[in-house]
From Swiss-Prot:
Enzyme nomenclature, EC number: 1.14.14.1
Protein purpose: Metabolizes arachidonic acid mainly to 19-hydroxyeicosatetraenoic acid (HETE).
Protein name stated in the entry: Cytochrome P450 2C55
Main location class: endoplasmic reticulum
Source organism of the structure: Mus musculus (Mouse)
UniProtKB keywords: Endoplasmic reticulum, Heme, Iron, Membrane, Metal-binding, Microsome, Monooxygenase, Oxidoreductase
Tissue-wise expression: Highest level in colon. Low levels in liver and small intestine.
Length: 490
């Protein structure tokens, strides 16, 4: 038989099979565009701006629709009401973690971010309790952040007002706060091993936001055998985990069961307590994955928010001037900012919230999954079905935030200039899977940004009207463009 005819017949059969599967499930899953065989709806999605495609599909199919990434159906939830219903009202039913193929290869479904079931619940509960015992959400962690913010200021002063690339110096501060909790030490800002870890994290976040990685996650079986940037991500994570393993071994050699120094010690003690339980989730592999999760998430997300925030403040000089005036009035120049100041600084508080809302760091959240068969609105979502929630559709809702594409702290101020809370503010997600480190991140952002603006004026290398704040990546997360600036002592 002619090879071309065989190919045509094969493709036709695949198309018919796909249509049959799609139609047979259409009475259950939400509506959506018809997928192609094997590749699904990938060609119908703008991989460089997935949120834009989701917005289009929501207008065609409604706030809940189905897309196929490869051969697997994914339910997409768009808009505040639908997102809240899925993650909050049905939080337990949708508390599963959807697949993120690159991390499955790296962490083997361990840790607190990408694990599932009993494993996830036990590791998350332990992590939250342990982080709290080391000051998370308490005055003690605030003291550490203040101390680190002061170290950052001293490091910036050493530049003597010369041109500075903030990429790595800003990552050092939040990373050192996390390191003090999990490793019981901080690093000098010039430490080569430390800077190498920061570079690996920065490089990975950029690669994870590339269109190639979205294709990889949709077609992992095929892509696994091809060269590509996914191999660089795995190599970088191997290097990071190798460093962490070295620190774990040091802790094992010096462990005092009665006096835990940090998160690693607490985990090792828990392992010892459960050593006779063959089903224990507390293993050396789980320790490695959990520490990696906390270290990576606690460093890079806050770093990017700080970096993006300074870029926005560099461009919007009128906002910066108002914040500095409030800092001078409430705090002055001779003491460090503290969290108690926040209630008397509504404009600064609004500025920090607006940075997070505007940059929309993780536009479509980390994927969730149904832990059981779920009746969601008028649809039936089978157990294991992946769920993507559009945080962009909430953070950039034009009814809650008029002109959402404009950076404006007024989005969080009432008519009297008082800070105004919004239920639509969910950069850390909501529900059972919301970010473990939300309280820490909020504290870091307020204290570090106010400390920088208390001590420095920001000066741009180019005219402020020429500053581009458009993200250079806009898939899994949003990455600001590279830039340089002058930190001029006040």
């Amino acid at each position: 038989m002619d090879p071309v005819l065989v190919l045509v017949l094969t493709l036709s059969c695949l198309l018919l099979l796909s249509l049959w599967r799609q139609n047979s499930g259409r009475g259950k899953l939400p509506p959506g565009p018809t997928p192609f065989p094997i590749i699904g709806n990938i060609l119908q999605i703008d991989i460089k701006n997935i949120s834009k495609s989701f917005n289009y599909f929501s207008k065609v199919y409604g706030p809940v629709f189905t897309l196929y990434f490869g051969s697997k159906p994914t339910v997409v939830v768009h808009g505040y009401e639908a997102v809240k219903e899925a993650l909050d009202d049905l939080g337990e039913e949708f508390s599963g973690r959807g697949s993120f193929q690159i991390f499955e290869r790296i962490n083997n479904d361990l840790g607190v971010i990408f694990s599932n079931g009993t494993k996830w619940k036990e590791l998350r509960r332990f992590s939250i309790m342990t982080l709290r015992s080391f000051g998370m959400g308490k005055r003690s962690i605030e003291d550490r952040i203040q101390e680190e913010a002061s170290c950052l200021v001293e490091e910036l002063r050493k530049a003597n007002g010369s041109l500075c690339d903030p990429t790595f110096i800003l990552s050092c501060a939040p990373s050192n706060v996390i390191c003090s909790v999990i490793f019981h030490n901080r690093f000098d800002y010039k430490d080569e091993k430390f800077l190498n870890l920061m570079e690996r994290l920065n490089e990975n976040f950029k690669i994870l936001n590339s269109p190639w990685m979205q294709v990889y996650n949709a077609l992992p079986t095929l892509i696994n055998y091809l060269p590509g940037s996914h191999n660089k991500v795995i190599k970088n994570f191997t290097e990071i985990k190798s460093y962490i393993l070295g620190r774990v071994k040091e802790h094992q050699e010096t462990l005092d069961m009665d006096n835990p120094r940090d998160f690693i010690d607490c985990f090792l003690i828990k392992m010892e307590q459960e050593k006779h339980n063959p089903h224990s989730e507390f293993t050396i592999e789980s320790l490695m994955a959990t520490v990696t999760d906390i270290f990576v998430a606690g460093t890079e997300t806050t770093n990017i928010t700080l970096r993006y925030g300074l870029l926005l403040l560099l461009k919007h000089t009128e906002v910066t001037a108002k914040v500095q005036a409030e800092i001078d009035h409430v705090i002055g120049r001779h003491r460090s900012p503290c969290m108690q100041d926040r209630t008397r600084m509504p404009y600064t508080d609004a500025m920090v919230h607006e940075i997070q809302r505007y940059i929309d760091l993780i536009p479509n959240n980390v994927p969730h999954a149904a832990t059981c068969n779920v009746r969601f609105r008028s649809y039936f979502i089978p157990k294991g079905t992946e769920l993507v929630t559009s945080l962009t559709s909430v953070l950039h809702d034009d009814k809650e935030f008029p002109n959402p594409e404009v950076f404006d702290p007024g989005h969080f101020l009432d008519e009297n200039g008082n800070f105004k809370k919004s239920d639509y503010f969910m950069p850390f997600s909501i529900g059972k899977r919301m970010c473990v480190g939300e309280a820490l991140a909020r504290t870091e952002l307020f204290l570090i940004l106010t400390t920088i603006l208390q001590n420095f004026n920001l000066k741009s290398l180019v005219d402020t009207k020429d500053i581009d704040t458009t993200p250079v990546a806009n898939t899994f997360g949003r990455v600001p463009p590279s830039y340089q600036l002058y930190f001029i002592p006040r």
